[in-house]
């Protein structure tokens, strides 16, 4: 049973192909892009409420036209919202990958000094305390007088962008979750597509989601 849910796997049968031993496989819960508990459903809803209130104010300022308003929320504001909704110790993030995609050296001119432009990409994993988690990518671009400074700033912006995408992406997680509930997609806490409970049918068990 999950630490934060009432889902039980008692009575669930697992089978494997002939010649394989099920004991050789490790079955574990995986809550990627799926709320692991009512706690995360509620707290993600609170986060979305704060995002909507913030973008509502931007919209009525008539300054940005038809832009994706959520993208205009500063990273530090979203992080503050996350701390308020999930708690300071209720979520964490980890940089899975960061790459410099492009580096351009800009030659000096009469009115400009030499500079460096760097484009970076990052992939961040965000985990809530009930094991709900998601991944997202982000980009950062910076032009600075020195190459090292340009690389550092571009990577920092890429990480911030990826983290923002994680937090903003929770809206889709909840919407997909609600649709699956209405469609009776979940069976005893596992996805229908990954587990078979038909007697006599064999399959290699994958990660339980």
UniProtKB/Swiss-Prot annotation:
GO biological process annotation, one example: double-strand break repair via homologous recombination
Pfam family, one: Rad52_Rad22
UniProt keyword Nucleus, yes or no: yes
Keyword terms: DNA damage, DNA recombination, DNA repair, Nucleus
GO cellular component terms listed in the entry, alphabetical order: nucleus
InterPro entries, sorted: Rad52_fam, Rad52_Rad59_Rad22, Rad52_Rad59_Rad22_sf, Rad59
Primary localization: nucleus
Record localization: Nucleus
UniProt keyword annotation of DNA repair present: yes
Protein family membership: Belongs to the RAD52 family.
Role played: Involved in the repair of double-strand breaks in DNA during vegetative growth via recombination and single-strand annealing. Anneals complementary single-stranded DNA.
Assembly and oligomerization: Interacts with RAD51 and RAD52.
Stated name of the protein: DNA repair protein RAD59
Organism of origin: Kluyveromyces lactis (strain ATCC 8585 / CBS 2359 / DSM 70799 / NBRC 1267 / NRRL Y-1140 / WM37)
């Amino acid at each position: 049973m999950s630490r934060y849910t009432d889902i039980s796997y008692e009575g669930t049968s697992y089978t494997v192909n002939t010649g394989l031993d099920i004991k050789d496989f490790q079955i574990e819960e995986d809550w990627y892009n799926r709320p692991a508990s009512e706690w995360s459903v509620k707290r993600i809803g609170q986060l979305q409420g704060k995002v909507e209130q913030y973008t509502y104010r931007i919209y009525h300022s008539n300054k940005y036209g038809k832009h994706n308003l959520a993208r205009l929320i500063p990273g530090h504001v979203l992080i503050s919202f996350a701390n308020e909704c999930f708690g300071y110790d209720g979520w964490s993030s980890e940089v899975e990958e960061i790459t410099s995609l492009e580096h351009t050296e800009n030659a000096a001119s009469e009115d400009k000094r030499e500079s460096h432009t760097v484009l970076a990409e990052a992939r961040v994993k965000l985990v809530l305390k009930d094991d709900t988690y998601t991944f997202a990518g982000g980009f950062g671009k910076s032009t600075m007088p020195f190459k090292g400074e340009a690389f550092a700033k571009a990577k920092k912006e890429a990480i911030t962008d990826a983290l923002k995408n994680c937090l903003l992406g929770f809206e889709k997680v909840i919407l997909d979750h609600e649709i699956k509930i209405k469609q009776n997609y979940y069976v005893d806490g596992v996805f229908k597509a990954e587990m078979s409970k038909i007697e006599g049918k064999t399959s290699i068990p994958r990660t339980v989601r």
